[in-house]
A protein has these predicted regions:
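Hydrophobic micro-packing sites on short alpha-helices
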Residues: 61-66, 76
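Short basic helix-loop element that most often maps to the first helix and adjoining turn
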Residues: 20-37
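N-terminal flexible/basic segments that precede or flank functional cores
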Residues: 1-20, 94-96
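Short alpha-helical DNA-recognition segment
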Residues: 32-48
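Short, charged recognition helix plus adjacent turn
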Residues: 77-97
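The DNA-contacting recognition helix of HTH DNA-binding domains
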Residues: 33, 44, 54-55, 73
Length: 97
């Protein structure tokens, strides 16, 4: 068997990976989206869109949400590329030789 990478468009975008870091952190801490949104000074709907990778947050919003989660921005910026790499590895499709 040969492994081939899925199409480049199948890789998560950075905004999706950042959103996943925020969502995972919030869930791990059993926090409600409305509470984190209030502390970050964004609407719950906007935070939900960021977490789902629908919105591309500015650096200021990333900082605000990170602060609301008591999560250093440097941790977010380290974890997000790792999540993209993990998804890339899982996107390899086996092909019969």
């Amino acid at each position: 068997m040969i492994a081939v990478a899925a199409a480049p468009g199948d890789r998560p975008l950075m905004r999706e990976a950042i959103g996943e870091v925020f969502r995972t952190t919030r869930h791990h801490r059993s926090e409600r989206i409305s509470d984190v949104a209030r502390r970050a000074n964004v609407s719950p709907q906007y935070l939900s869109e960021v977490e789902r990778g629908v919105k591309d947050p500015s650096s200021e919003i990333v900082e605000s949400i990170s602060t609301a989660l008591d999560l250093p921005v440097s941790d977010v910026l380290r974890q997000a590329p790792r999540r993209i790499d993990t998804h890339q590895v899982s996107n390899f499709l086996p092909v019969a030789a």
